[in-house]
Amino acid sequence: MNIHPQHHYYLPAEWYPQSGIMLTWPHEHTDWKPYLQDITETYLRLAHTISLYESLLIATPHVEETKQQLKKRLSADQMSRIYLYEIDSDDTWARDHGPITLIATSPDRSHTVPQRLLNFNFNAWGKKFAYEKDNAINQQLYYAGAFNATIEDHSDFTLEGGAIESDGQGTILTTASCMLAPHRNQPLSRTEINAQLKRRLHAKRIVWLEHGHL
């Protein structure tokens, strides 16, 4: 890992302005198979709303089919903001298997610093389901030129995007039930995991919730 010391990288809050959204499209080999028509309709509505305002990156094993579905519902202007990549997946939870983005500005704010995409190991919430294809999506998208950013390999540490929240000021919120669950980062202790999260996410402190799920 080689972060320029003059640049303060941090994990932005959920409400921070964003340039785009990533979706992993449902298909017949996901758990959505019995409800594929209904869930595809939901994703088409998502794509319609997102593309009114910002870019949309879609990973799908059926690019042409997905494109035709979108073209029937979206305007040409909306379609110009959609980027399709032919990539297979186990499931659709891009929030969890997608890259975690760090942002930064130069000290004098004279220029924009490239974003850093953190590619963690994803193992379907502790090896509960198939995950090998989902775990490969970020690298495939990166090498296909989908991201206007550099990528950092954190595949030696298991973490999904839905396991953490940030206030954008250096505080990360997580839960003990998630981070200490089996088949994740054992044999690391809680203290060691805390240190790993701070270092990898450039955080000042980690707040652990002892109950509930995040």
Predicted regions located by residue number:
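The feature marks the mature, well-folded catalytic cores of soluble enzymes
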Residues: 1-214
